[in-house]
From Swiss-Prot:
UniProt keyword list: FAD, Flavoprotein, Oxidoreductase
This protein's name: D-amino acid dehydrogenase
Entry keyword annotation includes Transmembrane: no
GO BP: D-alanine catabolic process
Gene Ontology cellular-component terms listed: cytoplasm; plasma membrane
Required co-factors: FAD
Protein family according to the UniProt entry: Belongs to the DadA oxidoreductase family.
Length: 417
């Protein structure tokens, strides 16, 4: 089968890889000069199935109001009055109760755990290198209340069979030794030993190279203009001055998927803006070993080979890609608090990206009401965590193979029904 994939971020490239491995003729189109140059370029770097959780959670509406008046708030928003933004926010609020939170987190963990297994299999069968580490993730609590609230997430982890350790303050340095000299008081942490880390852009670039060697055709520096519909099918996609024709089409354009699909199928995928710093390591012994997550600021600090990636926060501000100095200061503050001698902050590069977020936190993977149009988007902050699993599931669905895990609650039908 001929398959055209729109988008060459980590989601588009993993989709291409698994579809090619299933025997399909795959073409990938992207407006950038190469793979992984937008949202996949500088994300936080953690592959954290156990921490897969929606922003829509109990208590978030009240917290969001408080955060509006805080200098270093993890969530911010700027209302533009658009119906799409208001509808998305309303749908998110409807998912903030305990029942929806547990349901959404459970399916996110299911997909993320499966994806980590797919990534492990990919490492075994290829020579791919992405500065990966398999040393777990440590969530840090600055307040006793955060430590106590961990019980809610632990219940979901236990049900999903995810190993974990709830650590008192004195044991944090057994996982991350450099925290022994942290510049801030901590109240404990939650350690997930099976989580991983790695450079998402490096992975995307190297997998694209191996996909090309397997026959995948990449078309870069080409705008995806519109899908050509005829009845219940897509007949082609207009890309630049050309029209590409295939048997199946996959939209993996991240936050830009919504605009392309607006006259075809309505999807609630909104650009959730995030930021990161990438800085060279100063003292390896004073740097993190893997990934730590600061619960107060919703910021992750991740160790690569010779670099530290600091990423997080969420802004509902549309497609604004500006780099406010205040956001940089927040990331710098978290680094100074936790790893004051770990990295060279004056040499840090500052980046922003738009995560494609759904109101319930779960991505849109699979078929649409059009018989040959498929989605792989809406992964929010977990695109790197869920990429391999989403790509494999999509390949199974298109190939008519029964997926290994449940997929019916990942499709767009939960919003269009």
């Amino acid at each position: 089968m001929r398959v055209v994939i729109l988008g060459s971020g980590v989601i588009g490239v993993t989709s291409a890889w698994y579809l090619a491995q299933a025997g399909h003729q795959v073409t990938v189109v992207d407006r950038q000069e190469g793979p992984g140059l937008e949202t996949s370029a500088a994300n936080a770097g953690q592959i954290s199935p156990g921490y897969a959780a929606p922003w829509a959670a109990p208590g978030i509406p009240l917290k969001a109001l408080k955060w509006l008046f805080q200098r270093h708030a993890p969530l911010a928003m700027s209302l533009d009055g658009s119906l799409f933004q208001l509808r998305w926010l309303w749908q998110m609020l409807r998912n903030c109760d305990s029942t929806h939170y547990a349901q959404n987190k459970a399916r996110m963990v299911r997909l993320a755990e499966y994806s980590r297994d797919c990534l492990a299999q990919l490492r075994r069968t290829t020579t791919i290198d992405y500065e990966g580490r398999q040393l777990g993730t440590l969530q840090l609590f600055r307040t006793p209340q955060q430590y106590e609230n961990a019980a809610r997430d632990i219940a979901v982890l236990r049900e999903a069979g995810v190993p974990y350790r709830l650590l008192p303050t004195a044991q944090l340095s057994t996982v991350e030794p450099a925290l022994a000299v942290a510049g801030v008081r901590l109240s404990g942490g939650l350690h997930l030993p099976h989580d991983e880390t790695g450079d998402c852009q490096l992975f995307t670039r190297h997998l694209a190279q191996q996909a090309a060697q397997s026959g995948v055709h990449f078309i870069f520096s080409t705008q995806v203009l519109r899908l050509l519909r005829s009845g219940a099918r897509i007949q082609g996609v207009q890309c630049g001055h050309d029209t590409l024709v295939a048997d199946a089409y996959v939209v993996a354009l991240g936050a830009y998927s919504t605009g392309l699909l607006q006259d075809i199928v309505a999807i609630p995928v909104y650009p959730l803006k995030g930021y990161s710093l990438t800085l060279p390591i100063d003292d390896p012994d004073a740097a993190p070993r893997s990934t730590v997550l600061d619960e107060s600021y919703k910021v992750a600090i991740t160790r690569f080979d010779r670099r530290i990636r600091v990423g997080g926060m969420a802004e509902v501000v549309g497609f604004d890609m500006s780099l406010p100095l205040a956001r940089r200061r927040t990331l710098e503050r978290v680094v100074r608090d936790l790893y004051p001698r770990g990295g060279l902050l004056p040499q840090a590069s500052f980046w922003s990206g738009l995560r494609p977020a759904t109101p319930d936190g779960t991505p849109l993977v699979g078929a649409t009401p059009l018989e040959n149009l498929y989605l792989n988007t809406g992964h929010g902050t977990l695109g790197w965590t869920m990429a391999c699993g989403s790509g494999q599931l999509l390949a199974d669905i298109i190939s008519g193979v029964t997926p290994t895990i449940r997929v019916d609650d990942l499709s767009v039908s939960r919003y269009t029904a």
